[in-house]
Amino acid sequence: ITPDRFPEFYVVTVDPRSETIKFYNDNIINKYKGKIKGIFSTVSNPNTVKKARESGVEIFWFHSLVDYNEGEKSFNQISALMTRAKNHENGLPAIQTGGNVGTTSWFLGWKILNCKTIALIGINHGWEDTDSWETIMTHNGMCKMVEMDKNSESFKKLFPRIYNPDFDCYCILDPIFQYYSAGLKEFIFRSPQDIKTINATEGGCIFGDRINSMKLEEFLIRFD
């Protein structure tokens, strides 16, 4: 999957963390210099934005919606007041992020790029059976490790192991992934009927109503 096969090639950055710079400090970015467009949230890390520009990525901006509209105390309201765009006199497009770049990309595909068929690739929203409990319980080091009885009902509720019938596999969710996956599934379910969502990740917990699953190879053949 490269800009050579897909000329309208976009990448998305929504996270303000400094670690996002690594995605633009990669040989593949240099290989396709000038062929990649970037859609960035207004809260993206400035060093990441700078590196993307240096790598020849053409940048487009959007305003990320991260909480409910509660008037002047809403972060949406505060960040909107801080944002100025000389080329967008009426403001930037505002998009629900779902708290993660995968859900953001799905929304951008639908609402901004006007795609009728959206494929999910690499969006597990869960952990593999082979991942360590330390990785799962800390969300890969992002949260503090807390000792829990793994046989307790509370633990099973916080870290459920679920079966994906579409790909005949199991995955384990943590509280963060439960929030992410529930939000994305609700957005997909409530989207217009002409919007088709295909999960080509070949694993994970994204399955259910209005989600068609198939292998990536099959998707590329059927929707070439």
Language-model segments: residues:
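Metal-ion/cofactor- or nucleotide/acyl-coenzyme-handling active-site neighborhoods
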Residues: 1-224
